[in-house]
Amino acid sequence: RLTLNVISSDFPGEQADSAYRYRRSWEVVEILKQAWTQDEINYDGEIYKLKGLSTDPVRPYQINGGPLLYFGGYSPDALALCGAHCDTYLMWPEPKDMLAQRMRDVHAQAEKHGRLLDYGLRVHMIVRDTEQEAREYADELVSKLDDAAGAAIRNRALDAKSLGVSLQSANRDRADEDGYVEPNLWTGVGRARSGCGAALVGSVDQVMSKIDDYMKMGIRSFIFSGYPHLQECEIFGTKVLPQLKTVSLPHAYGRVPSTTPATPLGVGKRK
């Protein structure tokens, strides 16, 4: 049931350089892997030094590596860490040719360690019966947004100065006058939030076709959302989700318990 996403951001009140933050993430991931696979943690890193620390009770029921690790980042340090230690490289929306290059770059890092990665995409959704309805809703969503207020919202985020966020901003700069950086990929949602700054906008068939294109590229992990959350969840869950091919990556990797966990969720009575 559990997968983990590693984010190498500053802590609140902290301003650390990129190299330090990725070094810290690297060490944390290596420590976690010891915690999930060994009886003791013994680690002598640049930042963390631990000796004889018992891993009880954090060891999971999995006996083959622990939960899957998702990771996002665009700098050389980020790609090196993902290639060495993580399972799924998680991307924000960009034109497909740019996504393909991201995948090639991190694949080259994973190859150095004899590893293969999965790929994921985090993207917002606006899906309606027709493209016109979807585009009209997208326009309505930001129709009352003041650009200065949107900039203030983005700048409050801890990741406001990150490379990934700057690349999302570049998408908006490349977009056409309606905010589309490629067919059905709308950057307007990024005017009012940091992080993932684009949405798939279109009819059910158009959105399904776009997702299918991503799958053919090798992306098989998706994180979808929409605004307002409940409304868009119901629309997507009714119109798109039943048509999607699904896969459980923990099962695909064999990263599941060998026995049913003796926990209330594992053996408790279902109502």
Q: What name fits each language-model region?
A:
Residues 2-6, 69-72, 87-91, 117-124, ...:
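Hydrophobic faces of well-ordered beta-strands that scaffold small-molecule active sites
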Residues 7-11, 74-76, 94, 122-128, ...:
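Active-site beta-loop-alpha junctions enriched in small/polar residues
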Residues 10-12, 93-96, 224-237:
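Glycine-rich, proline-tolerant flexible connector loops at the mouths of alpha/beta enzymes
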Residues 18-62, 94-216, 245-271:
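An alpha-helical appendage that flanks or caps ligand/catalytic pockets
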Residues 79-83, 212:
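Alpha-helical segments flanking ligand/cofactor-binding loops in enzyme cores
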Residues 84-85, 217:
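Structural motif
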Residues 205-208, 217, 221-222, 227, ...:
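Long, low-complexity C-terminal extensions of enzymes
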